[in-house]
UniProtKB/Swiss-Prot annotation:
Quaternary state and interactors: Part of the 50S ribosomal subunit.
GO cellular component entries: cytosolic large ribosomal subunit
Family affiliation: Belongs to the universal ribosomal protein uL16 family.
Keyword Cytoplasm in annotation: no
GO terms for MF: rRNA binding; structural constituent of ribosome; tRNA binding
Keywords on record: Ribonucleoprotein, Ribosomal protein, RNA-binding, rRNA-binding, tRNA-binding
InterPro entries: Ribosomal_uL16, Ribosomal_uL16_bact-type, Ribosomal_uL16_CS, Ribosomal_uL16_dom, Ribosomal_uL16_sf
The protein's name: Large ribosomal subunit protein uL16
Length: 138
């Protein structure tokens, strides 16, 4: 699973996920992409589950790029622990997703195969997505 090798700070503030993606919002590497139209968080497990679904469907053909990385630590306290005593320890990592962000890209397969692979991947994700193709002259 994806996670940072080392962080400057182990814990982060919660923050607010606002605005739209101004970077990483075009098909840059492959011919087809899965773009987020919703807002939310994707955990490292969800990113990996979607990647596996796509990889299984396209079998040996094509190439997949993961355009997001879970770099935000989410902390939680153990069960049945009273409030106070500081912030909990990091449990897992998430990627904050804004609308318009390109999540995955694919190349070397037909459009029908890519569309079906992305449909299977989208079923594993908690946010709304749309299939996009590379624009000519982009």
């Amino acid at each position: 699973m994806l996670q940072p090798t080392r962080l400057k700070y182990r814990k982060q503030h919660k923050g607010r996920n606002t605005g739209i993606a101004t970077r990483g919002n075009k098909v840059s590497f492959g011919d087809f992409g899965l773009k987020a139209i919703g807002r939310g968080r994707l955990t490292a497990r969800q990113i990996e589950a979607a990647r596996r679904a796509m990889t299984r469907h396209i079998k040996r053909g094509g190439r997949i790029w993961i355009r997001i990385f879970p770099d935000k630590p989410i902390t939680s306290k153990p069960a049945e622990v009273r409030m106070g005593g500081g912030k909990g320890s990091p449990e897992y990592y998430v990627a904050e997703i804004q609308p318009g962000k390109m999540l995955y890209e694919m190349d070397g397969v037909s459009e029908e195969l890519a569309r079906e692979a992305f449909r299977l991947a989208a079923a594993k994700l908690p946010i709304a997505t749309v299939f996009v193709t590379k624009q000519v002259g982009q």
